[in-house]
Structures are given as structure tokens and as C-alpha cells.
């Protein structure tokens, strides 16, 4: 029997409508995607068809493997709410989702309910206000960290657009919402600041797992700050041949067997057998 060819979401990109909206049910509510944004077109294609999108599937496979029934999750950098809903779909009973950019938060907040608490703030080392530089290429990537603009100048444009946003800390969120079993930190370079605002929580009630997207030298500093509670660190990658999730040595240099996706790392209190 002839095998059915694997379809990746980029195979469909030329024929996916690039304007208008598409809505799909996830975790007992409806999320709407704006098709002008490439990553939202990819989400829509995933919801409609059984297609592969390694960039977002790293998250999906991590959540499927590690989120337990009854987990309470901190989703920092929640964007429009796709990852927050995926956490709920995988068994989380409560997700506290942070998104500081006002026009994106409006969309996230439309999904709010008893099990999805939305917060219009950015994680940082302290409570207050700061400037965020807005992404001009799509609605992902806005950052409060100048070093990220050096890594991805095409995202922010020649003339930077800024907005004043509110900040909070992990310690404050735990005081307000209780402890979390899982943290997801995808906050465009502010992950170290987030840990510095989590010092009390890491001592008293650390999460079982931390998922964090980390660039450049941030990985070393991040690990130094969590190693006392989360001594096991892994790079999450998807194998090209099997499309299975692998948790690899973070120093791995030979990445050819894997899809090239954003550097997502897993920090665990206990050793994980791949």
C-alpha cells in the first residue's frame, strides 16, 4: 500500500486565505484567528486539518506529554490565547495568562472564564511600568529587552514603536492566584527578569516544570537561577523522521536530525527519561 505523504502547514501557505477571520472551538470555547498574520493562519490550518507545524507543535507536544489533570499553569506571553487553551485542553484546571500589549490582550480577554484568568501585564523583576517595543512584522515578538531587538531587527523596524505597559512579578501572581504546577515563559527576552521576580516562589513553592524560550547567553544565566530547584535541563526538539518530541542535551550541536524551531527548554525538578 502506498503511504500517504506527510503534509506540513507550509505546504498549504500558498493557498491559505490571507485576509479575514476563521474561528474554531478549543477547550469548550471559540478562538478567532486573524488570517493576515502568518502564525495565525498556521494555527487555523492546524485546527482545520491534520497538518504539521513544528514551530507550534513543540509546545503542543510538550503540553501533551507533561501537563497533568488538575494542573495550575502560569502562561506568560500568552498572545491571543492559543497556548492557554491548549493547556486547558490537556487537563489544566486553571491557567493564568499574561499579555501586556493592549490590542492583543483584548483578544485574549475575550476567552476569559473561571478557568482562564487574564492579566494585562508583563512579567518582570518588580511591579510597576515600563516601555515595550512593539513588533511591526506581526503580533508576536513585542519586547521590553533591547538585546532582543539586536537579534531580530526585522521584527521591530527602523523606527521603533513603543507603548507604556504595566509589569508584575511571579511572586505577586502566586500571592493573588495561588501556586502553579507549570510555568510557560515565552516573554521575548524578559525571562531572566521574571525569575528575579520569583525568588520567594522558587524557595517556597517552585513549579514542577518550567518551559522557557531562551536566546543567546540567557540560557546560562537562567539555569544558574533555577538550578537549585530545577537541576535538570533539556532542549525540546522534534525529530524530522518520526515527528516525535525529544528532550536533548541543551549543549547539543548536531541539530540536523531535528526541525529548526525556536529554542524551547524544559527545566525539571526530577530527571526526565527521553
List each language-model region with its residue ranges:
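S-adenosyl-L-methionine
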Residues: 1-112, 154-161, 175, 239-274
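Short aromatic-enriched loop/helix-cap "lid" or pocket-rim segments at secondary-structure transitions
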Residues: 129-134, 143-145, 223, 246-248
